[in-house]
Amino acid sequence: LSMSDSISVMHNGSIIQTATPEQLYEAPASRYVADFIGESNLFNGTVRQMQGDSVVLRTEQGLELTSPLTPTGKALSADVAGCIAVRPELISIASANADMTREVKLQGHVEDRIYLGNSTEYRVRTQAFGVVCVRVPRQQDHGANAFEHGAAVSVGWDHANGLAMAL
């Protein structure tokens, strides 16, 4: 993200967030901003309950996810449409039979493996959410740690790795 010191993101002719590149990536104000800079796994749903600075969201698939509010997400309230964004580099991947100690765990199959030089991106087809994108640093993705197309895997993340925000 070699950009300006401050960036304004516009949508439909209005500025929706002005921040540093790091703030835009780490604390997007909305789903649009989360998708604007970098890639995110975006899970839409309805806010079921607010718990302090966290949100319990019932996804469109009927699952409940808990995540902290993005610093600009204070406008969310119960029964409002919302979204939880999880960046690909914050999601773990392991063989399907591995003991993964993450708060959210999904089973799936590797649909695509993309070598990016400094990392490898896996696109994992899950029954719960469709395709989930996972990015693994190069030093962790070699030999026995690499997963080929069709491999049965588990993907997972902790609640703190997501950010709840307005659509």
Where are these regions (language model features)?
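Non-catalytic connector elements of ABC transporters
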Residues: 40, 49-167
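Internal alpha/beta loop-helix hairpins
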Residues: 1-63
